[in-house]
């Protein structure tokens, strides 16, 4: 059984190390502190092969996710904008489910 490893990287050195050990997808974290979309665009210049997954502070909004994909991100992670809610409320879980479905459909 194989395990797929997606490392979290914040520097070019870390990205190159991940690539050297065979990682195809690389999580860029924390993207909100590294410069956001501009950082990904800058990385793609010297690293056109980079299959980046930005993570950290990305809003659960279809247009924002689409923007990330349009600049070359292979996927995005969405956490805090979904999980800062009250999970004791069943409606909250349904709301999260609807948000995720919406994000996937508008890709």
Which role fits each region the language model picked out?
Residues 1-9, 17-30, 36:
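Active-site beta->alpha loop and helix N-cap motifs at the rims of alpha/beta catalytic domains
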Residues 7-12, 32-33, 54-62:
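Glycine-rich beta-to-alpha transition loops that act as phosphate-gripper elements at the mouths
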Residues 69, 85-107:
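C-terminal helical cap(s) of enzyme catalytic domains, especially alpha/beta-barrels
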Residues 5-8, 26-28, 51-56, 76-78:
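Hydrophobic faces of well-ordered beta-strands that scaffold small-molecule active sites
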Residues 13-21, 58-76:
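Catalytic cores of alpha/beta
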Residues 24-27, 39, 46-51:
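A contiguous pocket-lining binding segment that forms or flanks enzyme active sites
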Residues 27-36, 72-92:
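Glycine-rich phosphate-binding active-site loops on the catalytic face of alpha/beta enzymes
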Residues 1, 19, 40-47, 97-107:
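Surface-exposed amphipathic alpha-helices with a cationic face
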């Amino acid at each position: 059984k194989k395990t797929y490893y997606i490392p979290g990287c914040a520097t070019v050195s870390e990205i190159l190390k991940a690539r050297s050990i065979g990682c195809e997808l690389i999580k860029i974290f924390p993207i909100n502190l590294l410069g956001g979309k501009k950082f990904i665009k800058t990385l793609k210049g010297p690293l056109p092969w980079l299959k980046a997954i930005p993570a950290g502070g990305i809003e659960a909004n279809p247009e924002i996710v689409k923007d990330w994909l349009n600049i070359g991100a292979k996927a995005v992670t969405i956490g805090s904008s979904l999980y800062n809610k009250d999970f004791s409320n069943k409606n909250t879980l349904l709301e999260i489910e609807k948000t995720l479905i919406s994000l996937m459909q508008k890709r």
